[in-house]
C-alpha cells in the first residue's frame, strides 16, 4: 500500500523530486506523457547538485512550456510504497505555480498539456497526486478556484 505523508520541512539533501500544482487563469494544468494515456501534475527528479527550486522551474518549463509564472513552495511530501525505491520513504517538495504565458511548443517527453476546469479521472499516479492536490488545497486555501 502506498503511504503519502506531509511535512513543513525536511533536510534539503533528502529532497529528490519536485511536483508542481499548476494553474493558469483559474484552470488546472496537467501533462500527458507521450507513452501514457493518463494525466499528471508537472514534476520530476532533481538533478545532482541542483537546487530544489531550480528543479521545479526546470520541470515546469520542460513539461508545460511555462515561460512566465510565479512559483512558491507549499510543503514537503514523502511517498513510501512497496516496489518503489525498495519500499524506502522518498521525499519531494510540493510547489504551487500560476502560469501567465506558455511557449507554443513542448520540447520534452510530454505530448501535450491539458488546461481543465476539473481534475482528471485517469491519473498516472492515482495513489499519490490526488493527495498532493488535496494538501495543496488545504495549505493554500485555494481549493478548486
Each language-model region and where it sits:
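Conserved Nudix-box catalytic region and its N-terminal flanking loop in Nudix hydrolases
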Residues: 23-62
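Unchanged
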Residues: 46-70, 77-131
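…; additionally, a secondary subgroup of soluble metalloenzymes is captured
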Residues: 125-145
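Class I (Rossmann-like) S-adenosyl-L-methionine-dependent methyltransferase catalytic domain
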Residues: 4-10, 77-89, 138-141, 145
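Short connector loops at helix/strand junctions that flank enzyme active sites
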Residues: 15-17, 23, 34-36, 41, ...
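Acidic, metal-coordinating catalytic segment for phosphate/diphosphate chemistry
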Residues: 1-19
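Active-site beta-strand termini and strand-to-loop segments that position acidic
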Residues: 22-25, 97-99
Amino acid at each position: 500500500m502506498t503511504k503519502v505523508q506531509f511535512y513543513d520541512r525536511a533536510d534539503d539533501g533528502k529532497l529528490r523530486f519536485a511536483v508542481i500544482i499548476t494553474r493558469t487563469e483559474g484552470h488546472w494544468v496537467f501533462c500527458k506523457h507521450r507513452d501514457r494515456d493518463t494525466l499528471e501534475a508537472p514534476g520530476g527528479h532533481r538533478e545532482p547538485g541542483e537546487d530544489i527550486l531550480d528543479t521545479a522551474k526546470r520541470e515546469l518549463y520542460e513539461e508545460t512550456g511555462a515561460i512566465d509564472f510565479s512559483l512558491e513552495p507549499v510543503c514537503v511530501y514523502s511517498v513510501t510504497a512497496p516496489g518503489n525505491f525498495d519500499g524506502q520513504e522518498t521525499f519531494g517538495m510540493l510547489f504551487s505555480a500560476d502560469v501567465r504565458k506558455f511557449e507554443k511548443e513542448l520540447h520534452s517527453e510530454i505530448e501535450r498539456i491539458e488546461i481543465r476546469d476539473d481534475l482528471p479521472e485517469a491519473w498516472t499516479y492515482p495513489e499519490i497526486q490526488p493527495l498532493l492536490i488535496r494538501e495543496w488545497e488545504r495549505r493554500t486555501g485555494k481549493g478548486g478556484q
